[in-house]
Regions:
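Feature detects long, helix-prone N-terminal segments enriched in hydrophobes
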Residues: 1-126
């Protein structure tokens, strides 16, 4: 995104919210590394996004899938001021489990996350 992290993050959060995801966890990697190691790094955050209905169906299919919840979204700022977002692919996670019931929730999550990314793209290009 051609925006710094401080401007991109609210756009991403709103897009996730519109797609039915809540943010359960937030890690300010920059602040954590500064506090723990005394180092300065690029602006970097990790958000844990969850759609409760999808998570419930996935956990019903295989309780061990909880080790991969919530869906991780890493956002960091490049030296040129642009923000890069990297998103966990729920479809790949479902392939790691034998439970047949995981494919449908994983595909639904992937579709909703894709919709959120399209919303972000539209907001950035507007």
């Amino acid at each position: 995104m051609p925006k710094p992290l401080t401007e991109a993050e609210p756009i991403v959060r709103e897009a996730l919210k519109k797609a039915g995801f809540g943010i359960l966890t937030e890690v300010d990697v920059t602040a954590t590394l500064r506090e723990k190691l005394g180092v300065e790094t690029r602006p970097y955050k990790i958000l844990g996004a969850c759609n409760p209905g999808i998570a419930h169906r996935a956990l019903e299919a295989d309780p061990t899938v909880g080790a991969f919840l919530p869906c991780g979204l890493a956002m960091y700022e490049e030296p040129n001021g642009e923000t890069i977002a990297a998103l966990q692919n729920p479809g790949l996670i479902s392939q790691s489990f034998e439970a047949a019931g995981l494919a449908a929730p994983a595909n639904e999550a992937l579709e909703l996350l894709d919709a959120a990314l399209r919303t972000v793209a539209q907001a950035v290009l507007a």
